[in-house]
Amino acid sequence: MHQLLIVGNGFDLTCGLKSSFVDFYKERERLGRQWSAGDESTIWDIILYDSYQESRSRWCDIEGEIAHWVYGADSEPAAISKCVANWHEFIGDRPTNATYNYQDLEYPDIYSYACSKIGCQIDCGSFASLLKNELISFEKHFSTYLTAQLQQSDDYIEQAAKWGNALLHDEGASSGWSDDSSILNFNYTNPWIELCGKAAVDVRCIHGSLADDNVIFGMDAHKAMEDDVARPFTKAYRILENGVQGSSDARRLAWRYDPYEENTRTGIIKIFGHSLAAADYSYFQSIFDTVDLY
């Protein structure tokens, strides 16, 4: 019988790694508060800082903030549309070399930063391109941060081995059980190959990994793939764009019941350290549909 283990950031946190987005944000809060040309600030630092200042819960949820800006939520339109419309109303017929007082706008620092990068003739296309390019830079900064945390950790691998073995080989391994396991890893770290061996366990780092230098942030693709602005920011699009290992062969993560094959179905699904948040809705829907878990 096959088992699927799904691990989220709670696994790395349990192993003592400062891998949460909150920990990362603490390192970059200054860049959002007071950016200057030539530093390593990105527009996402400013967006998240503004969200934090307004006490919105999305400040520690980059995926939720991405969705807010490029897709919207419920009846709320995408923030990018509102932002561009307000900007056009603000500049009116002023000449292109005019000086603007950004403090009169709802997002003064965001407008100021955007104009410093792409000029003041802002439209949805140029703004979306800026958001996408800066998201890639933001991901690189996160990779650098997380790599440093791994290097500073004295016992991450030891803790990962302890918890990983407990999860893979717990008391659920009863009669009819086999060692056939798959791991859906939502983390950017990947201790599993070192712990289990390449042949023993099928591991998918669905959002990329530090080792492959393809870490991604993105919003859930559910309902968003038909939106031209939002599509490039969806996880499904970014996974394909970045060539994340195993992304096109998700069928092997979970096995449907086959009456002609004994003990091949996915009989156990274990979830550890994952919030089941909306940003990963599509993954779980696909898995649960495959095993008919309803």
Predicted regions: what they are:
Residues 36-249:
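Extended, H/D-rich, highly charged conserved domains that either
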Residues 28, 196-199, 291:
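Active-site catalytic pocket residues across diverse enzymes, especially alpha/beta-hydrolases
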Residues 21-45:
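Short catalytic helix/loop segments, enriched in acidic residues and glycine
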Residues 1-18, 24, 256-294:
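SIR2/sirtuin-family catalytic core signature
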Residues 15, 21, 25-28, 210, ...:
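Solvent-exposed, flexible loop/coil residues
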Residues 251-255:
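Extracellular beta-strand/beta-solenoid scaffold signature
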